[in-house]
Amino acid sequence: MTACGNPSDEDSQEALQMQQSDSETTPETVTQQPEAANMETGVIAEQILSGNEGDIHYNYYLPENYDENKAYPLMMTMPGYDRMWFGEDSSGSNLEWSGFRVWTELPEDMIVVSAQLTDWHETSARQAVELTEYFIQNFSVDKSRVYAAGYSAGGETMSKAVAMRPDLYAAYLHGASQWDGTYDPIAENGVA
């Protein structure tokens, strides 16, 4: 890392290898969860995805009129340090965060996800990508409208995640944080 937080060539190479290997395994079609007709809507709290890098704690919002036959925008939100996963006592603390709630209150229906990760480094960035892919594969998501937003430590995590997989995200809102990801893959893939 340089003093400005730009990754070394080694970090860029790792991100490129991950992007290439991930893009080979990511399906191109929208798939839904098998029980979509019985799916709970509104805010769904305290979920755990057993991921390749360990458990991913998250909460999400499905529009009240969620329809498996309609493709929805997906917003991946990443809170700052005070809303990260520190054990059961912190479970669901990101639901109180306005960076999650504001997206659920927009007039347009969208799926909103807020992860509670354990750090803001490479592992959490890979978990953020894995969680994004999980929602794309298991919910009715418009793959051309996958967005991300990160604040503070969550901004550091999402800047790395978006740099790892710029093909996954259409746009990224980076707030109150240093940029830890690389710029080139983002510019090359037209991420707004």
Regions found by a protein language model. Give the residues of each.
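The feature captures the conserved acid-bearing segment of alpha/beta-hydrolase catalytic domains
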Residues: 170-192
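Alpha/beta-hydrolase fold active-site loops
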Residues: 73, 110, 145, 170, ...
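Gly/Ser-rich "nucleophile elbow"/oxyanion-hole loop immediately N-terminal to the catalytic nucleophile
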Residues: 65-66, 70, 120-152
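Extracellular/periplasmic catalytic domains that process cell-envelope and extracellular macromolecules
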Residues: 51-53, 67-71, 104-108, 140-141, ...
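A domain-start/cap signature at the N-terminus of enzymes
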Residues: 4-72, 149, 153-156, 160-161, ...
